[in-house]
Amino acid sequence: MAEALCSGSVASPCGEVGVGFAAGLVRGAAAAAALAESVPIGGYSSKSTFPSGRVALTERKARPLPRNLEAAHGQMNLTIGKAMRWWEKCLQPNMREIESAQDLADSLLNAGDKLVVVDFFSPGCGGCRALHPKIAQLAEKNPEVLFLQVNYEKHKSMCYSLHVHVLPFFRFYRGAQGRVSSFSCTNATIKKFKDALAKHGPDRCGLGPAKGLEESELMALAINRDLNFTYTPNQDLVPIADALLKEAAAPGGPWLPLPATATQLFIQGSENSLLSSGR
């Protein structure tokens, strides 16, 4: 029997030679290989490329998203980010945000005789957010006026130096006059803003270069260590009495007479009048 099995044939009861077990095993292996080619295994597709029934597994690659879906996803993220920055909506060509104290000072000086409105706001200020669309409309109707936005959260130290403690807050500057108006208003008091715009906005001939920030404001910004702002006071604006006191107090400097007080001048004037009258 063992020899018959090894020879691959066995006699049937009817005298016919049956199919050998070895042949059956070969057919079974071939069927298993064919089945393996058509059945995926754990995210892999099986493909037989080797002889003797060996199976090679190739990894399935994920299909890339269509370009239109990727673009839509990016636009959605961009829209969400922009929706949170309400102060950037409805901006007009004559509206821009201030980046630093130096930027504010230079912008006012370079505006010439143009009316400049400085808008102090905060992203978390509900009144500022409600008023912003109306300010943008007024900017659109008055293209000759320059609107400068100052973000209070980004420039707290600068706002402290400029004595801005309430929001929304506005300051109007015009040419050689410098600051011509300063106030706070909301939607309920928007008429105050419109009146100031009508009063200081009409075209007129300037009598000198733009003044910009006040001298005291420039000094306050210069001594603020949190700001990268430098300013040299104009020597022409230093009072004569202060200059005399500094020179007289300087060690080794020439002695200069101090200016007379108001009382001394009054007494001297009285004596002169008495002498002239002959008393």
From Swiss-Prot:
Pfam families: Thioredoxin. This is Thioredoxin-like 1-1, chloroplastic. It comes from the Eukaryota. InterPro entries: Thioredoxin-like_sf, Thioredoxin_domain. Disulfide bonds join C125-C128. Probable thiol-disulfide oxidoreductase that may participate in various redox reactions. The active site is at C125 (nucleophile), C128 (nucleophile). PANTHER family: THIOREDOXIN, MITOCHONDRIAL, THIOREDOXIN-LIKE 1-1, CHLOROPLASTIC. GO terms for biological process: cell redox homeostasis. Keywords: Disulfide bond, Electron transport, Redox-active center, Transport. Belongs to the thioredoxin family. Residues 56-202 form the Thioredoxin domain. GO terms for cellular component: chloroplast.
